[in-house]
Structure formats: C-alpha cells, structure tokens
C-alpha cells in the first residue's frame, strides 16, 4: 500500500534528531531507545544489508555498537560509553585524528562567516587551497578541481584525461587487477572487483586491466593497444592498493610505469585518495620513488576527518583543456568554504606536527610487531605488510579474518576488512596514534590470535 506523505511525522523526526544533536550524554533509557531506533531505521529506510555486515564484526552477534561521538584524537565512543581505539580510521579519513582542534576551529570560524559560496563571486579559500596544493604536490602539478569524495576526484581525472587525449585519438584507459577507484560509472570502470561491476554492466568502453605490479604486462598492453589503434589515453594506478588488500608493488614499478607512459604518450593518473596526506610516511606515496603524475587524485584525509572534500590536481598542460570553458566539469558543493577551511587546516597540522614522519616511525613499530606475531601464529596469519600506517594482516581464510575483527572489537580495538580482499584486515589508524596506543594494539592482537587459535583447535 502506498503511504501518504506526512509533514507532521517528518517534523517530529527532525525535532527528535535536533534534540539528540544538542545532547552530550545519554542516560541508560535514552541509549536503549536510540539503539532501537537506529537499528529500525537502518532496516526500514537506509539498507538492511548494512545491519548484517555490522553483525559480522560485532562481539556477541548483536548491534550493540551504535556510534555516538569521538573520544580522544584516536578513539571513538559508542552509546554505551565504551571507548575504542580506532585502527580503521574511517577507511583513511582521520589522519590528523578525530575532531582535531585546529581543523574544527577553522571550520567553526568559517561557519560563523559564510558556510557556502555564492557560485558567482570568487571564493578566497578555494584559491588558497589550490595554491597550497600546487606548492605541496610533486612535480609540475599546478591546478586543482575540488569535489566532495574520492570517487568524484577519480571521475574528474578520467574526464580530464579524456578531454586532453580525445583530440589526439587516444581513448583507452589501463587500470590494474585488484584496483579500487570508486563506484560511480567511470570510476567503477577502472575498479577491478566483479562483485561491484557485474550488476552495472556494460560499463564505460575502453578500459583494460593488467596485473598490478607487473611491468611487463603493462608494456605488453600498451604495445598491443597501439598496434590495434586503441591508443592509451591514460594509465590509472594506486601507488599502494588499499582495498585490494594493501598490496605494495615491487620496488621500481612506479618509476617504470612513468617511463612507459612517457614512451607511449599516455597520461599517468595516480589515485592517492587513500595513500595521500602522510599515510605512508611521505605526504604522497609516489614521493617514495620520486614519481610525478600528470593527474593526482586526493580525498579522504584531505578534509581532516571533519569535512568531505576531494581534489583532482593536474599539470597546466593537461588542465588547460578546461580553460576555455571552465563549466565543462563542475559541482555545486565542490570547493565550498567549509571544506576548504578543513583542508587548509589539515595540511597545516600535517606539516606543523610532521605527521608523515610519525606515520613512518609508528608504522614500522606496528608492522614489526605484526610480523613477529605472524611468525608465532603461522596457522592463522598468512602475511603482514604495509608502508607507514597503511598496514594489512592477511589471514589463511576469510572466516579467520572475520573472527579476528570480532575479537579485536571485544578488546575495544576497531578494525575492518578491505573491500577487494576479504581475507585481509587493515590497520589504518590516525597518524596521531600514541606509542602507548600502538603497544595496546599489539597486545590486543596477540590476545585475539591466542583466542582464535583455541577456537580453531576446539572446532
């Protein structure tokens, strides 16, 4: 039966939500009521599938963890007052921590003046952020287009590459197996997981995939495309595959891809949505081997875990195709004052506190610990790998990975799997994680593995 719209019901919902937003704490009954409401509304109005996913990593098989607020820079608190060390980091958005005071203050100050821009007058923070990124990014990257997410930044990069290369008769894109670039139609065409792709086939034509890290396969594909007249417009890569399971390419792979792109007059698009902003021990992962892309995609941590923002940064030669008609690709909210304020403050914090170097130091500590635990539990752990504070623990099968996440949850450590590799749990905490918290994470990992060994043996 079709239901009639109800203004009264909508008004009551908004009043209830606004009341919750104002609250700092909940009593026991309010907590129970909120949990019931959230579960019901997810089931009836968001997507019931998310509830089953949440159950798979919640101790006891229930929905007890309804997120309420950030705790410290590096922790989350649920409606029951339980505090969790965040080793998931919102899939890489909290590089400067939760509610970083510098970022929050910048956004609050901008909010008091002007939340959104007029669309007609020139907005100063967009200009200042573009200038900052031109100074911060490697090579000849100079111009920035701002959006609201990583998927959008990739979509803009693909369109920009098309606009630049189409007059040259180049229409083919090469991506890699295991890649994740987003789920909008263009980005999904570059993404490599069939689960995400199949329901939306056919995707955009002209996308090819080669094994990640295999430079010979890349050369062969570029050569064959040239032979058949399907000349390559661009190669799109993650310097380290995040959702693929934190897969690091062989040393020298990225410079070799850059050289091939130059040889075949193809653009190099680097998707640093997850690896950028200090995550791997450098401001951008491509800097580990001094690789300079033609187009760089950023998002996630760029907004400091406070505001959503994406950026597509390109060289002047490539970006100039949009000079004559800047309206070829635009977005209403991209580059808005609040998001730009957050991004500028985030970059300031990353540089002032030298967080990329901290990520390298603490990441080495964590990875060394996980590798040692892997040697102690070879029946459970297949591999541990990573760079900086982008780390993966790969288990011998999917079920061990799910059980490990649940055990860590029980010890108040938040972790989760990767989208393209379900055997792999990622460790992607804020770069502000303390040494003491790193030690807690390693201790909890040891306890979780010991408990899993017992449960596997009993089974």
Curated annotation (Swiss-Prot):
Keyword tRNA processing: no
SUPFAM superfamilies in UniProt: PLP-dependent transferases
Reaction catalysis annotation: an alkane-alpha,omega-diamine + 2-oxoglutarate = an omega-aminoaldehyde + L-glutamate; putrescine + 2-oxoglutarate = 1-pyrroline + L-glutamate + H2O; cadaverine + 2-oxoglutarate = 5-aminopentanal + L-glutamate
UniProt KW keywords: Aminotransferase, Pyridoxal phosphate, Transferase
Record-listed E.C. numbers: 2.6.1.82, 2.6.1.29
GO MF term list: diamine transaminase activity; identical protein binding; putrescine--2-oxoglutarate transaminase activity; pyridoxal phosphate binding
Membership in a protein family: Belongs to the class-III pyridoxal-phosphate-dependent aminotransferase family. Putrescine aminotransferase subfamily.
Record's protein name: Putrescine aminotransferase
């Amino acid at each position: 039966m079709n239901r009639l719209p109800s203004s009264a019901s909508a008004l009551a919902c908004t009043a209830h939500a606004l009341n919750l937003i104002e609250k700092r704490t909940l009593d026991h009954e309010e907590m129970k009521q909120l949990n019931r409401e959230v579960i019901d509304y997810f089931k009836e109005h968001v997507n019931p599938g998310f509830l089953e996913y949440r159950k798979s990593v919640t101790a006891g098989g229930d929905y007890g963890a309804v997120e309420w607020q950030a705790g410290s820079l590096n922790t989350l608190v649920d409606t029951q007052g339980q505090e969790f060390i965040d080793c998931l980091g919102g899939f890489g958005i909290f590089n400067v921590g939760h509610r970083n005071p510098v970022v929050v203050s910048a956004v609050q100050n901008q909010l008091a003046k002007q939340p959104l821009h007029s669309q007609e007058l020139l907005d100063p923070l967009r200009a200042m952020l573009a200038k900052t990124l031109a100074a911060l990014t490697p090579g000849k990257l100079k111009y920035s287009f701002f959006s609201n997410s990583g998927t959008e930044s990739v979509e803009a990069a693909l369109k920009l590459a098309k606009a630049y290369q189409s007059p040259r008769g180049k229409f083919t894109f090469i991506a890699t197996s295991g890649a994740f670039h987003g789920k909008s139609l263009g980005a999904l065409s570059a993404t490599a997981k069939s689960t995400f792709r199949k329901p939306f086939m056919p995707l955009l034509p002209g996308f090819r995939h080669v094994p990640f890290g295999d430079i010979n396969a890349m050369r062969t594909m570029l050569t064959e495309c040239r032979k058949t007249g399907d000349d390559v417009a661009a190669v799109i890569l993650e310097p380290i595959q995040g959702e693929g399971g934190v897969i690091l390419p062989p040393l020298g792979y990225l410079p070799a891809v850059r050289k091939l792109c130059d040889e075949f007059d193809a653009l190099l698009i680097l998707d640093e949505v997850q690896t950028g902003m200090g995550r791997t021990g450098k401001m951008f992962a491509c800097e580990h081997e001094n690789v300079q892309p033609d187009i760089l995609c950023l998002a996630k941590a760029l907004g400091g875990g406070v505001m959503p923002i994406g950026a597509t940064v390109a060289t002047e030669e490539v970006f100039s195709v949009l000079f004559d008609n800047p309206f070829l690709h635009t977005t209403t909210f991209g580059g808005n004052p609040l998001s730009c304020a957050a991004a500028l403050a985030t970059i300031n914090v990353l540089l002032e506190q030298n967080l990329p170097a901290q990520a390298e130091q603490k990441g080495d500590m964590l990875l060394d610990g996980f590798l040692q635990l892997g040697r102690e539990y070879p029946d459970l752990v297949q591999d541990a790998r990573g760079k900086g504070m982008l780390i993966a623990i790969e288990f011998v099968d999917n079920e061990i990975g799910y059980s490990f996440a649940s055990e860590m949850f029980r010890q108040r450590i938040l972790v989760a799997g990767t989208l393209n590799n379900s055997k792999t749990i990622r460790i992607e905490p804020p770069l502000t994680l303390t040494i003491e918290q790193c030690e807690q994470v390693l201790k909890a990992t040891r306890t979780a593995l010991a408990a899993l060994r017992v449960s596997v043996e009993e089974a």
